[in-house]
Every structure is written in C-alpha cells, then in structure tokens.
Amino acid sequence: MRPSQRSADAMRVVRLTRSYTKHAEGSVLVEFGDTKVICTASVEETVPSFLKGKGQGWVTAEYGMLPRSTGSRMRRESAAGKQSGRTQEIQRLIGRSLRAVTDLAKLGERQIVIDCDVIQADGGTRTASITGAYVALADAIRGLIDAGKLSATPLRDQVAAVSVGVYKGQPVLDLDYLEDSDCETDMNVVMTGSGRFVEVQGTAEGEPFSEEEMAAMLGLARKGIAELLAHQRQALNV
C-alpha cells in the first residue's frame, strides 16, 4: 500500500491557478498534492546574442527552491554563489520541454523566460514545473496575440510531465516524497499532447528494473499525462 493510500495508477490532486501573480505576462500556481510551484512567464523584446538577426525567438527557464520549501532549511543558492548541478539539470529540462512544442520562428525576435519557484516540495517538483510552465507560457503568448505582436500562436502542442517509479515492487504513478525517497526505480516522463516523448529519465536506485516494469511505468505515465493535459486545457478554457 502506498503511504498516501492512493491506488498505483492514481495521481495526487492537481490544481492549476492562473494569474497567480500581478506583474508577469503569464503566471500559474501549480499544485501536485502538497508540491506547490509558482511558474511565471516574462516576455523580453530581445534574444540571446547567438540568435540576434536570425528572425527567431527563444524560450528558456530558471528553477529554484525556497529555503524552507523542504523539511529543513536549505541555503539559498544565490548566497552560496553558484547553482547546484541538480538545479541546472532541471531548468534545462524545463526549457527543452517548452521549446519542443514551440515554433521559435513564429515567436519573432523575442525571448520568453519561465521562472519556476518551488514554495513547497513533496516530490515531483520538476514535473509539476513543466506542467505549470506550459500554462504560464500559453498565457504570455495569448497576451502577445491580444496586443497585436503575434498574429497566431507559436505553440504547436501541449506538453506535460509526471513521475513514475517502482515502489515496494509495484509500478506507481506520481510519486510523493516518501515514495521517491524509498523507491527502487524513479522515472520522469515528459510528453506532448499528441502522445510523443520529449524526455524519459529513469534510474534504478537499487534493484535494476525489467523491460516489463519499464513498459508498465510508461503506461502509467501516459495515463497521468493525459489527465494533466486535460487539467491544462480546462485551466486555459480551450
């Protein structure tokens, strides 16, 4: 039995609250159970130097955790003077996931920066960040269309992410912290609305996993992501 008493194929309660902050062009509070992340999208009328004059835009992301988002206080990475390898890996994953569903040529020479700030962590912060970041990005793009700066959306598809794993010998969906810290296998899956994979990150923490277990985990991920895509559409009223 899972610590949360959920069935193996059950997601935590998911909420997407749009327009959560006042200033950003797009903002969302995403909740996967007790994991809570604020995702904001900021439009900048400039592009990185490597894209100047090329007629296309860029979508990138930054990720961070508040010092007391976890059980004991963490030192701010800005105070330490450098980002951890984990932080860099996660923010690159978020950026890759969003660019996978964005036609950068249609975005024009502008950049949209997504900031994902974890205010409470209980497992799945990167997958919650990707899922919420898409909604924040979509809202920022709607604003550009409404302002007449874009004639059509550059978004080609939705994108969402979920964790799966093997916990006490059973493949399970959407691991919370207790499961994540005690699982035999941990996997993060990022998929588009059309059912294509952006990324699959899987690691055996102890006993190696079988091909059958991998297939079961991917099946659970498809189910969970289908639910997340529906949550996104409902939040965006599409």
UniProtKB/Swiss-Prot annotation:
Q: List the disulfide bonds.
A: none
* Reaction catalyzed: tRNA(n+1) + phosphate = tRNA(n) + a ribonucleoside 5'-diphosphate
What terms describe the molecular function in GO for this protein?
3'-5'-RNA exonuclease activity; tRNA binding; tRNA nucleotidyltransferase activity
Q: Where does the record locate the signal sequence feature?
A: none
Report the EC number(s), separated by commas if there are several: 2.7.7.56
Q: CDD domains of this UniProt entry? A: RNase_PH_bact (cd11362)
Task: Decide whether keyword Magnesium is in the record.
Answer: no
Q: Which SUPFAM superfamilies match?
A: Ribonuclease PH domain 2-like, Ribosomal protein S5 domain 2-like
| Top-level taxon of origin | Bacteria
Q: Where does phosphate bind?
A: 86, 124-126
Keywords attached to this Swiss-Prot or TrEMBL record, sorted alphabetically, are:
Nucleotidyltransferase, RNA-binding, rRNA processing, Transferase, tRNA processing, tRNA-binding
Primary enzyme class: transferase
Q: Which GO terms describe its biological process?
A: rRNA catabolic process; rRNA processing; tRNA processing
Q: Does the keyword Nucleotidyltransferase apply?
A: yes
Q: What does this protein do?
A: Phosphorolytic 3'-5' exoribonuclease that plays an important role in tRNA 3'-end maturation. Removes nucleotide residues following the 3'-CCA terminus of tRNAs; can also add nucleotides to the ends of RNA molecules by using nucleoside diphosphates as substrates, but this may not be physiologically important. Probably plays a role in initiation of 16S rRNA degradation (leading to ribosome degradation) during starvation.
- What family, per the record? Belongs to the RNase PH family.
The record ties this protein, via NCBIfam families, to: RNasePH
User: Which HAMAP family has this protein been placed in?
Assistant: RNase_PH
| Subunit | Homohexameric ring arranged as a trimer of dimers.
The name of this protein is Ribonuclease PH
This chain's source organism reads Chromobacterium violaceum (strain ATCC 12472 / DSM 30191 / JCM 1249 / CCUG 213 / NBRC 12614 / NCIMB 9131 / NCTC 9757 / MK)
Taxonomy of origin reads: Bacteria, Pseudomonadati, Pseudomonadota, Betaproteobacteria, Neisseriales
